[in-house]
Amino acid sequence: MRLAILTDIHGNVQALDAVLAELDRQQVDEIWSLGDMIAMGPDSNEVMARLLDRGVHMITGNHDEAVLSLLEGKGHPESYVHTRPHHEWVARTLKPVYADALFKLSRTIERDVKGTRVYGIHYHIPTEKRGVPITEEPFHDIVEATLSNMQSLYGAYEADVICFGHHHPEHVFRDDAKHYFNPGALGVARDNLARYGILEWDETGFAIHLRAVRYDKRAFLEAMERNDVPQRDVMFRLFY
């Protein structure tokens, strides 16, 4: 059994296509996408088309939910005020069929695979905020990637493997009870690597693999310019 873990694709269809081609060669059994499929990059519609066509199991992230909140007329998170012009552009250009698909998604996913409880979430949400909208800032602030911090965030989760994203660098930690796995952002990096992860089971147990594949970053950057993506200069400086 091979379960692929993707997160933070962020509208980067070039990076996603490179990863999907790799997954085809590896013959994975299931794919999860742990939120932030859309926004930042120029091709949110194309990304959603690929994921739906592949039957990828998706959950929402903060960018997805911020765009959906605008589409519903329910406002925009105060802490994301700097991203509002960009999110408004995504909301205007996102095709209704893909918005509808995003509206149907949950914030979490879980599966028992050969006795291993696997749980996916975009990032930790405190218990008291599990049901609140994105305008009430449900996702925990990003913390430094250390084992003790992961234990503080996810230690009470009833699972053996906690998979998440949001914080773009990859990190893998383990204690006696749990594995904490962030494969890294697929679509946002300084280099030209698209990152993802594989959980693999055999007769002896399971293993976690970090993976990365090169993609055509020049084509991605050209698409950002061609599509006149709002706030792209800021994103180039901070993320790409």
Protein language model regions, located:
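Beta-strand-turn-beta hairpins that frame and shape the catalytic cleft
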Residues: 1-4, 110-119, 175-180, 205-207
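N-terminal active-site segment of His-dependent metallophosphoesterases
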Residues: 1-54, 229-231
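Active-site neighborhood of phospho(di)ester-bond hydrolases with catalytic His/Asp-centered motifs
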Residues: 6-7, 31-36, 57-62, 121, ...
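Active-site environment of divalent metal-dependent phosphoester hydrolases
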Residues: 10-15, 39-41, 63-69, 126, ...
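Active-site neighborhood of divalent metal-dependent phosphoester bond hydrolases
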Residues: 54-111, 139-155
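Anionic-ligand binding region
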Residues: 123, 132-172, 179
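Acidic, His/Gly-rich catalytic cores of divalent-metal-dependent hydrolytic chemistry
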Residues: 161, 173-240
